[in-house]
């Protein structure tokens, strides 16, 4: 039970931080008329989640930290629902731009998740060897 409470608190704190960053990014990009904020959030969040996933396979942290950063921070920062809403709104005015936006979100998100995963794998494996060699 105590572990569950730690995880819930970590998810709440991570979610508050992630959501706050998402709000700030959307506020900063709002005047562009294009959903750059959501695109950036989802690509950066995908990179970060890919990085953390790989890192946590090599360097195993406490479960509450994994959940706080993954479910909380990344979950609060990224947003599928806003991606969907932005796509529909963009489609109503600029159908081709909507297609580009969805493709960039999908392929950019997956590509950057893979990039983060591969980068963390190299860094974490090197770090683990250095620590083991010390």
From Swiss-Prot:
It holds the Pfam family CRCB. GO terms for cellular component: plasma membrane. Keywords: Cell membrane, Ion channel, Ion transport, Membrane, Metal-binding, Sodium, Transmembrane, Transmembrane helix, Transport. The chain crosses the membrane at residues 8-28, 40-60, 69-89, 99-119. It catalyses: fluoride(in) = fluoride(out). Its main location: membrane. It is a multi-pass membrane protein. Na(+) binds at residues 75, 78. Na(+) is not transported, but it plays an essential structural role and its presence is essential for fluoride channel function. HAMAP family: FluC (MF_00454). Belongs to the fluoride channel Fluc/FEX (TC 1.A.43) family. This is Fluoride-specific ion channel FluC 2. It comes from Halalkalibacterium halodurans (strain ATCC BAA-125 / DSM 18197 / FERM 7344 / JCM 9153 / C-125) (Bacillus halodurans). The gene is fluC2.
């Amino acid at each position: 039970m105590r572990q569950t409470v730690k995880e819930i608190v970590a998810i709440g704190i991570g979610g508050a931080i992630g959501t706050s960053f998402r709000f700030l990014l959307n506020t900063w990009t709002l005047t562009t008329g294009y959903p750059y904020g959501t695109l950036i959030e989802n690509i950066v969040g995908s990179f970060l989640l890919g990085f953390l996933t790989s890192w946590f396979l090599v360097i195993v942290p406490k479960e509450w930290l994994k959940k706080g950063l993954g479910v909380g921070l990344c979950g609060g920062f990224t947003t599928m629902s806003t991606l969907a809403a932005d796509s529909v709104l963009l489609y109503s005015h600029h159908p081709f731009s909507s297609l580009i936006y969805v493709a960039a979100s999908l392929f950019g998100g997956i590509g950057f998740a893979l990039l983060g995963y591969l980068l963390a794998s190299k860094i974490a494996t090197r770090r683990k060897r250095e620590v083991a060699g010390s």
